[in-house]
């Protein structure tokens, strides 16, 4: 029996989002975190079928569209990639909101989107750009020292922006699109160093995103973000920008309401600001997504790679 999975693809600043509209098994009616756990425990093969080759690629971020728990939410969503599941995804939320408009589900205005780490507020503007009011972001630790084999001592901040990040400003690497291989090798070594040293986020949270910053002549900063699974973010990374704002706010380098223009390694830009909150900040990230495909993924029973090429 052939299985069919309906998808709509978009990209946000070059970073793709694959919205799964239908075709996944029922995950029950619990919270997005509970449904994510069911998906991971019982139906993870659907994630790999959508994201891994031959139907996907390491760059893709998947977003499973779910019925929300709260009646005042526009949608629920579970984010995943080639290595597992994400608590929140900024660029993905922008892509989801833009796609919901394409589907005729929402119009311009403010919409609530349920995620596994909480409900985020997203505004679809008249020009179809999207502002995402993220979950609470905060810096967990400042100036953490780490020895990275092959590179020497490294210092960075640990911050939460919806995922855990290790943020490095003084790294000696050239943050540019033609230097991605070297940036990936460096960031991967840092992540391995963190794991080896037992350095984590709060409550033992795995630091699975590494963010490198550099000056940019046209914007406030340019960044390279290594995501779980060794793919780099083509967008400026919404959760990473949120983590960056948390550090800037903690250091008194960015005032509430001031706009921070964050460029990605390929030059796409998010505009970000924050309001102060108890225990950290609440950031808002604005960017644009563009639609790229509508498709039906076919899964044949006799296909040896029907659930993806799993390494």
From Swiss-Prot:
The keyword NAD does not apply. It comes from the Bacteria. One of its GO terms (molecular function) is 4-hydroxyproline epimerase activity. InterPro entries: Pro_racemase_fam. Gene3D superfamilies: Diaminopimelate Epimerase, Chain A, domain 1 (3.10.310.10). SUPFAM superfamilies: Diaminopimelate epimerase-like. Its EC number is 5.1.1.8. PANTHER family: TRANS-3-HYDROXY-L-PROLINE DEHYDRATASE. This is 4-hydroxyproline 2-epimerase 1. It comes from Burkholderia multivorans (strain ATCC 17616 / 249). The gene is prdF.
């Amino acid at each position: 029996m052939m299985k069919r999975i309906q998808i709509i693809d978009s990209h946000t600043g070059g970073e793709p989002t694959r919205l799964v509209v239908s075709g996944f098994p029922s995950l029950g009616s619990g919270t997005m975190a509970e449904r994510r756990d069911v998906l991971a425990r019982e139906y993870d093969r659907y994630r790999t079928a959508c994201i891994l080759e031959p139907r996907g690629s390491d760059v893709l971020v998947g977003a499973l569209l779910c019925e929300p728990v709260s009646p005042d939410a526009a949608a629920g969503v579970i984010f995943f990639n080639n290595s597992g599941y994400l608590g929140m995804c900024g660029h993905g939320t922008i892509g989801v909101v833009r796609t919901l408009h394409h589907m005729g589900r929402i119009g311009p205005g403010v919409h609530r989107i349920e995620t596994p780490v909480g409900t985020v507020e997203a505004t679809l503007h008249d020009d179809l750009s999207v502002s995402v009011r993220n979950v609470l972001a905060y810096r967990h630790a400042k100036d953490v020292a780490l020895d990275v084999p092959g590179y020497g001592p490294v210092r960075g901040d640990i911050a939460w922006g919806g995922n855990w990040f290790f943020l490095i400003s003084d790294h000696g690497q050239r943050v540019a699109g033609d230097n991605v291989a070297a940036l990936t090798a460096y960031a991967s070594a840092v992540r391995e160093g963190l794991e080896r040293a037992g350095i984590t986020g709060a409550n033992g949270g795995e630091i699975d995103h590494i963010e490198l910053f550099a000056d940019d002549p046209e914007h406030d900063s340019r960044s390279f973000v290594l995501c779980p699974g060794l793919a780099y973010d083509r967008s400026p990374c919404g959760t990473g920008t949120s983590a960056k704002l948390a550090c800037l706010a903690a250091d008194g380098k960015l005032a509430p309401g001031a706009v921070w223009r964050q460029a990605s390694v390929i030059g796409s830009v998010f505009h970000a600001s924050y309001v102060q909150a108890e225990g950290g900040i609440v950031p808002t990230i604005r960017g644009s997504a563009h639609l790229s495909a509508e498709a039906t993924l076919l899964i044949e029973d006799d296909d040896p790679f029907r659930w993806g090429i799993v390494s």
